[in-house]
Regions:
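Short Lys/Arg-enriched helix C-cap and helix-to-coil transition segments
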Residues: 139-146
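Basic nucleic-acid-binding alpha-helical/helix-turn surface characteristic of O6-alkylguanine DNA
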Residues: 1-122, 169-173
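Regulatory, non-catalytic segments
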Residues: 126-135
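Short, hydrophobic-biased amphipathic alpha-helical segments
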Residues: 44, 142, 162-163
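…primarily DNA-binding HTH/wHTH and HhH modules…
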Residues: 149-173
Length: 173
């Protein structure tokens, strides 16, 4: 039961050129930027409520408004890096993988194998792929920059067309 004054996860939506994103913040940090039609969005939201021991409410916050502003700049080709405080909900291994994603430069790509090697676990390619798939902060933790070893576009929570658009923004194709 939620008590009066308990901090809850605030949620808003952002309509991007690639589809609708669900944004959430908790304690002045962004904790979710996920594609609303992602089949795993519900799982990511459940992970947040368990991790933070609270529930969602539809309300804006300064963090969510700033996130929307920075996303607008990104989609307009005016922003290459995000300056939003994040609150990640995941395992230590997932955090390690997500931090490796943050090191992929704007406009560059890496393979799942590259990420596995970056974190010192070269045989953990499938586990790395699973951690990338569990990323609940799309675009800002740039899982769209991960491609197949053969340079093919591979799965993405927002769909391959969204991945193509995001990479196109970053490479000015």
């Amino acid at each position: 039961m939620i008590s009066m004054g308990e901090v809850r996860i605030c949620i808003q939506y952002y309509d991007s050129p690639c589809g609708r994103l669900v944004l959430a913040s908790f304690a002045d940090r962004l904790c979710l930027c996920d594609w609303s039609d992602n089949p795993f969005a519900e799982r990511n939201m459940l992970r947040l409520t368990r991790n933070m021991k609270t529930s969602f409410k539809t309300e804006t916050t300064s963090v969510l408004e700033e996130t929307k502003r920075q996303l607008d700049e990104y989609f307009a080709g005016k922003r290459k890096a995000f300056d939003i405080q994040l609150r990640l909900a995941g395992t230590d291994f997932q955090h390690e993988v997500w931090n490796a994603l943050l090191d992929i430069p704007y406009g560059a790509t890496k393979s799942y194998k590259d990420i596995a090697q970056c974190i010192g676990k070269p045989k953990a390619v499938r586990a790395v792929a699973g951690a990338i798939g569990a990323n609940g902060i799309s675009i800002m933790i740039p899982c769209h920059r991960v491609i197949g070893s053969d340079h093919s576009l591979t799965g993405y929570a927002g769909g391959l067309e969204a991945k193509r658009v995001l990479l196109g923004i970053e490479t000015q194709i």
